[in-house]
Structure formats: structure tokens, C-alpha cells
Amino acid sequence: MMAALYPSTDLSGVSSSSLPSSPSSSSPNEVMALKDVREVKEENTLNEKLFLLACDKGDYYMVKKILEENSSGDLNINCVDVLGRNAVTITIENESLDILQLLLDYGCQKLMERIQNPEYSTTMDVAPVILAAHRNNYEILTMLLKQDVALPKPHAVGCECTLCSAKNKKDSLRHSRFRLDIYRCLASPALIMLTEEDPILRAFELSADLKELSLVEVEFWNDYEELARQCKMFAKDLLAQARNSRELEVILNHTSSDEPLDKRGLLEERMNLSRLKLAIKYNQKEFVSQSNCQQFLNTVWFGQMSGYRRKPTCKKIMTVLTVGIFWPVLSLCYLIAPKSQFGRIIHTPFMKFIIHGASYFTFLLLLNLYSLVYNEDKKNTMGPALERIDYLLILWIIGMIWSDIKRLWYEGLEDFLEESRNQLSFVMNSLYLATFALKVVAHNKFHDFADRKDWDAFHPTLVAEGLFAFANVLSYLRLFFMYTTSSILGPLQISMGQMLQDFGKFLGMFLLVLFSFTIGLTQLYDKGYTSKEQKDCVGIFCEQQSNDTFHSFIGTCFALFWYIFSLAHVAIFVTRFSYGEELQSFVGAVIVGTYNVVVVIVLTKLLVAMLHKSFQLIANHEDKEWKFARAKLWLSYFDDKCTLPPPFNIIPSPKTICYMISSLSKWVCSHTSKGKVRRQNSLKEWRNLKQKRDENYQKVMCCLVHRYLTSMRQKMQSTDQATVENLNELRQDLSKFRNEIRDLLGFRTSKYAMFYPKN
């Protein structure tokens, strides 16, 4: 009788040979018996099946008729289908409110009690606010927050408090999943907008926490990474709602209560770009590379030189060359009159970048001249005196060191060392300092003449020349960071940096393999040398190559390293071996052959694959990576801490002297009665300005939030998910319309009535 509920299947066109044979007609070896090993529930009656089917189809009158005619009580309203769903659960899933009200009227309230079924879709510790946040439902969260709901604060992964220890001991998986659910709730854009006064700052902090959690709980790495990306995209989308430069200025210059404040900059209404610096600190590449943010940065970068971008290429080149040639004159003009119109133009970040670059190119030119003016007569002097060009180089080095010291003072050690450019500058300046210090020591201690081959291997002059060579290499490599400003060379420079990081990972594996084979070959051949002359043979520099190259650890390392580049012509089989050395030669050949396979073939190809992956990763996000790196470089020129380039920055400027006198006078006046009153008025003015800025920020943030919500609603209406929801609503409306038509026509049956037993 129930067969009519399902569409019939026509098997007339199917041959009997294509159908599976019954177990009775086949041997036991040809069939496999199937048995349901799961929990077997009691079979529902016909009325119960019709009852659940009517609830699923939204047939209000069929459900009402079944409930009204259930006088004998043979209908179990708590019955469930094959999926374990009862009538109320099915009705809630289909959002049939009229049927749900009908079920509640007929005594189904007990079905609405807290469900203790382990097969339910959510765990018992998931609150409604968590589910609403998971769905990112702004309206439901608004209603729930009016009821003063609360969320448990997630503890750290390694927390050893009593509660965490008890939960871990009881069920560690459930504890980890609950922490993930809490963070999925906290990362909801709707919840962040409703509960946070500064949604952008909260998104930054939350993404950093999630990134750290992904490294600790590697089992849920993908989940935490996706949540961190969600927070980053939310901050980016919120910034994208800004419609003018004024709103961008308010957002990017906002300083939270936890950040240090620049009181002088606040009173002078200077741009500190605190929020942008914070975004770079939290590695918010999506936020920094957003179009609105980049356009605002371009405006600040060029400043009063805004017309430079619209000039032809030839005029741009002429402008850069003119500034690059006359940079000493421009520096002196700024040193004398920093507040003049000409001084303000020089203070523009773009002009500062060109002047600093020209100063550094001059320093590199002096390094080239150093090798050209080298005095051959002092070649064998053990302690040569410093030349004039040495003193010029020392001035530049002192200026660069002073610039690094100022940056270290204002940024802090942690932020200073995070920049690879600062690390390279620190190493380079340290090498130059050590070079000239050793030269001074050698000049004061040694006054003799002797051939260089007779000098001690660690003579101060020789060590100074070696350090100077390394410093020169780093000086030219420092030019790579200037490529960041170019849209063509910038992505290549970023890719090279990522490749160097991957090469460091590869180096750990390669050194282990090299050390392993070096130990084996050294132990095999350390007693095989025949004479002292052959024992002195090291590396690939032997005139008579033999396996005596492997007699020492250092020699074996050199040989195996150059073997990768086919530069170590090492004899694997000794042609002049005596009786009993065949096994030794064979074992050596096997070890070297294995090394060739592992390193030359496998590890080398692995390195190529890693470098290719790194390059492709940067290429896939080329625009984002380049704009983020360029913003980091630009920000270093936005403040007024290092306006003058080396060596002019070591000269005390009138501006610095005025600041020192002003600070000293304020300190002296602060101990007088008038000074204290003036200081109180200044603090009051500063607080009023800070409060006004905070109020403006909240107004702008409210506008951004409302625009973001409007944008999200428009996107939801154009997605497939919104289409499905609209179809469900249409289905419910049609069901209600059908029921109303039946009510008007007095028709109380449905298409399933033929299967219901009549009275």
C-alpha cells in the first residue's frame, strides 16, 4: 500500500543477467550477506509514517486531522523517522510555524525540553548566542545581546587551572572543540560589530591570537587559519566602506588607549598613522594593501610633490637626478631653515627618500674610490695609517649608526629587529666599526715592514681587510630594499627574501646529510694515507687526487660539498691498492654513490621544488605582497625623526636645539606655580582633543558598520544561499496558500488521505 508513495521503477528494459541473483540461487562463495549492525528502532505504524510525512510536507490539515482522529491513542507523537527526527524537529527545520503551533497545542511541549540525545547536531555546551554567531546573524545576535548573554572566556592551550585540567582529563577532544567553537563565535563579524567599540583593533588582535593557536593546536590548523583569514578580511572590508579622505584619516590615525600617544603630534594635528603601523605590526596584509589605504598612503607619500605623479617620464627622471646631485645643498638648506616653505618640501617623505638614497649612493661611490686610491707602497706595511677617504667613510658610518640608534630608541628593540633591513644595517655597521677599530689598533701597535706571506694569519690588518670585504658585500646588497618601491622589481625582491627563508629550512636537512656521510667516509679512509705529502692534501686543491682527500673531517666536508657542483674529482676506486683493500674501496664507492643519489639527485631537486613553490606563492599574491612591503618602507620616512641623511644628521640642527631648549624650559617651569597651572591647562587641552578624536572615530565607525551591513545584505541577496532561502520561503507561502484554499472550499483531505484509514 505504501508503494504508491514512491515513484515506480520500470525494469522491463533490463535483462535478467544484469540484475543480481538472489542468495538462494548462488553459492555461498559468490554472495555476501548484509546485516544492519546499528541500533534497530521500532517500526513506525502507517499512521505515524503519514504523520511524519505530513509534517515534512507542511500539510497543516493532514496533521490536524491525524491529531484530531487519534482518539484511540495508537499514534505516538514522539515517533521518529529513520534519521532520528521527531515531528517538532522536522517542523522547525522546515520553518512551518503554523504546524509547530498546532503540535504545541496538542501537548508536544515536552518535546521542546533540553535534548540530551548524543546524536543531536550540536553539543550541549553550545549556547544560542554561539550558534547565532556561527551563522553570522546580526538580527538574532541583537535580540540575544539585549538579554545580557555572556560567553565563557577561552583559556590558553597550556592553561593548568583547575577547570581546564578537569575538562582535559574528562574529554580533551570536547575541550578543544569547545575552544574552537568559542573562537569561531568571537571571530564572527556580526558579534565584533555589536560588542566592540573598535572593531578593527579587535579584528587585528583576534587574528593574531588565532594565528598563534594554529601553531599550537596543529590538529585544528586549517580551522584556526580560516578564522584568522576571516578576521583579516573583515577589517579590510570595513575599511573599504570609507568614502572620503577625511574618514580614512580618522581611521588610520586613531590611537587606542593601550598605545603610546604623541602629545605634541596630537596638539599640532600631525598624522601619526598609528592604526596603519599597528596593522603592519600584526601583519595585516589585506588591510594595508586595500585600495583606499594605498591611495591615502600615496597622498601622504608625495605630499606637496603631488604633481610629480602626473609628470612625463623624462621630467620625473630629471627631477630625481637634480635632487640626487644637489642633495648636499638641499640638506644644508633644511638644516638652516627647516620650517620654511623650501624646508617643508624637503620634509616630504618622497623627497626624504630621494635624498637618503642619493646619500647612500655617495657612500657606495666612496667605497669604490677606496680601492682605486689604494697606495701600493703601503702594501707591506703592517700598520698603515688611515687615509683621507677613510675619515669620510667614518663620517658616513657614524651617521648611519646614529640613524639606527634613533630608530631603535623610538621603535623599540623588538620592532627594530623585526625588519630585515634594520638587521642588515646593524651587521653592516658593526663590520665597518670593527674594521676601522682594527686598523687603528694595527697602526698603533705595528710599525714594521714585511712580506704579507710572513704575517700572522690573524694579523689585525688582515682581519680588518676581510671584515671590510664582507661589509662591502652587504653594503651593495642593501640596495635590494630600494627595489621595493618598483612595481616590477619589488615582487622579485620579495620572492628572493621568501626563497632565502626556505633555503634556511633546507640547509638544516642538508647539513645533517653532509655530516652523516662525512663521518662515515672519514672513519673509512682516515688511516689510508701513505705519506705526509698526501696527508696534507685537503679538499679539491690536490695535484694528485686520491682517496687520501677523505683522511680528515674538514677535507671530507670540502670534497663532498664541491662534489655537488661536480668540482671535486675524487677517486672512488683506488687504482693502486694492495691485497685486502678491495672491500674498503667497494664500501667507499657505495657510500659516495648513495651520497650522490641522496644529495645530488633528491635533495637538490627538493630545493628547486621548494624555491619554485615560494616564488609561485608570492606570484599568486603579487599585488598584496608588494603593496604591503612598500607600505613598510614608506612608513619609515613618514615621521620627522630622521629627516637629514648621513653625514648631515650628526650635525645638531636649529630645530633640535629649539626642541631641547623648549623641553628644558618646560621642565623648569613645571616646578613653578605658573608652570604647574600652564601644564594643567595643556593637559586639559590635550584630553579634550583626545576625547574629540575618539568621538569622531566612533561616529565614523558607526557609519562604516552600517555600510558594511548594507553591503553584506546586498551580497547575500545575490548568492546561491539567499536563493535557496527564498525558495524555502516561497514553499512555505504556497503551503499556507494551499491550506487557506482548502479551508475556503471546505476540502479537508489531502493527496495523502487515500492512505489514511477512513472511519
Curated annotation (Swiss-Prot):
Organism: Rattus norvegicus
Keywords per UniProt: ANK repeat, Calcium, Calcium channel, Calcium transport, Cell membrane, Disulfide bond, Ion channel, Ion transport, Membrane, Metal-binding, Phosphoprotein, Repeat, Transmembrane, Transmembrane helix, Transport, Zinc
Bias type Low complexity, positions: 15-28
Topological type in the membrane: Multi-pass membrane protein
Disordered as annotated region, ranges: 1-30
PTM notes: Activation of PRKCA induces phosphorylation of TRPC1 and subsequent Ca2+ entry into cells.
Bridged cysteine pairs (disulfide): 537-542
Transmembrane segments: 353-370, 389-405, 422-441, 463-483, 503-524, 590-610
Assembly and interaction partners: Heterotetramer with TRPC4 and/or TRPC5. Forms a heteromeric ion channel with TRPC4, with a 1:3 TRPC1:TRPC4 stoichiometry. Unlike other TRP channel proteins, does not form a homomeric channel. Interacts with TRPC4AP. Interacts with ITPR3. Interacts with MX1 and RNF24. Interacts with FKBP4. Interacts with PLSCR1. Interacts with PKD2L2. Forms a heterotetramer with PKD2 with a 2:2 stoichiometry; has distinct channel properties separate from PKD2 or TRPC1 homomers alone.
Lineage: Eukaryota, Metazoa, Chordata, Craniata, Vertebrata
Topological domain ranges for the Cytoplasmic compartment: 1-311, 346-352, 406-421, 484-502, 611-759
Identification of the protein by name: Short transient receptor potential channel 1
Gene Ontology CC: basolateral plasma membrane; cation channel complex; costamere; cytoplasm; membrane raft; plasma membrane; postsynaptic membrane; presynaptic membrane
